[in-house]
Amino acid sequence: MDKLRRELAPISQEAWNEIDAMARETLKASLSGRKIVDVHGPRGFDYAGVPLGRLSVPKQQPSGEVRYGLHQVLPLVETRVDFSLDIWELDNIGRGARDPDLDALVEACRKIAAFEEKAVFDGFKAGSFIGLHEYAKDRKVGAVLNSDAFLDAVAEGQAMMRRDGVDAPANLVVSVDIWKFLGKSVPGGTLRSIVERQIGGRVVYSEAVKDAMLVSARGGDAELTVGQDLAIGYNGHDTTKVSLYLLESFAFRVITPQA
């Protein structure tokens, strides 16, 4: 038996397939951070920390010839969201239902995705994660919803990165308002397509940013390390409901703040 205990749930394989497909679809739409940073893993459920390649050497040490240092690691945070589904409704999948009520699953996916997104963009103090916004707060370029002014702001952002030694393609992470604005048609295509040609990367929609953020696409500048990737496990059940949970473990760090 594995740690997820899925084989104990009163759920058919057909229903599990539907549950997993819905979870993948929801998470893919909700996890923007994974589209713009390096993702390492999954390393496994027992992977607990990312080695940082440094020693912390205490100043106060016992007298004698032997001294010691402690390896620095970035611990992974493990997140979990519980939810319940109706057993009869899951059985309906086997009866041919094509619109099963999986709203509780969708909500759980959005909650756990929001936690990861917040950790990537805003940081997670308890885990010593510093988010992308923290590094970008002193390197802002004003942008308004005007085609020429917006393209100029993107160009200024690129110039700022080059002055900091980051001469590489970039991705632009944008809020919902800017995402809609970039969909407008202009000579040469949509404004989004013009921006993508300009930056050499992608425009990525995210609910975790308020305006827009330019992030290097060369790789090696920020990383999300995954231990246990997002997975659904079984808690228990009664005659009407099956209790499940969504689980993951991860750590995030920025390696090159200028990017």
Residue ranges and their predicted role:
Residues M1-L70, G227-D229, G233-S243:
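N-terminal "assembly arms/tails" that initiate or stabilize quaternary assembly
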Residues D2, H40, S185-A259:
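Sequence/fold signature of self-assembling virion shell proteins
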Residues V50-D99:
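Long, hydrophobic/aromatic-enriched structural stretches that serve as scaffold segments
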Residues Q72, M160-R163, G233-Y234:
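A generic local secondary-structure boundary/capping motif
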Residues V81, A168-A170, T240-V242:
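Structural beta-strand/beta-sheet cores of well-ordered domains, especially the beta-sheet scaffolds
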